């Protein structure tokens, strides 16, 4: 039997994102009374826990029997067009049933389906909306069905559809929250002294990276056949798997070295010197450096004082 969580117990195993929790709790409390849940858009960078928060919220969305509704997770990248959605997902699983649907990476929805959902989500005056698609008629009942959408690229959503959604946006995790996630993931491991804080400084401010670092520590402790992790162990692990100060990866170190040596660079020059494509630099390598304040872009790319310090720490033993 599924149990209903209270406002105070929801999300208790998820660290941080207090603003997200407050917003979702408000909408969940309302749904438990009215059976209507808004069309929520969970938006944030990769690894910030959108899917986990969606799953946890879904457990508190109640059906007419007062129990949690069934949950359906749809990877939108697998939906080729509206016809596939209606014939393979909506008709057999959603229509006429009580269900909470997560449309994950919803920016990847095909345009014809985004347009159709725009019509379906226009529900100012009714809980039931009938949508015609080609030769079929499909019925959405929003007292039976709730839709949660999640994306890392909200700017790619069809703007009119985005306007129909209730935004719940995520923030980066701070070092204290990162440390809490690692500790929660490894409840049986004792961290000695300030080693957990040192570990947290190398994590990329998101939940997924925190869990990945925790798994590395867990594997290390298993190989040593002990459940205690010290600063000496951390130094050994960093050496073995190549963990650098501030969590810098080799491509980022290469960019910082280039900027320090040359003073400043255009994107084309940085690409030529490092061998990384312009797209790879802009979409991946530069993002973390900009977020941490290790570089800035003022026409050309420049390293900052914080970037010089991070580079020196990351290359001190190299």
Feature roles, as predicted:
Residues 21-22, 68-98:
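Short glycine-rich substrate-engagement loop in P-loop NTPases that contacts/grips substrate
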Residues 152, 166-178:
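Conserved AAA+ ATPase "SRH/arginine-finger" region at the nucleotide-binding site
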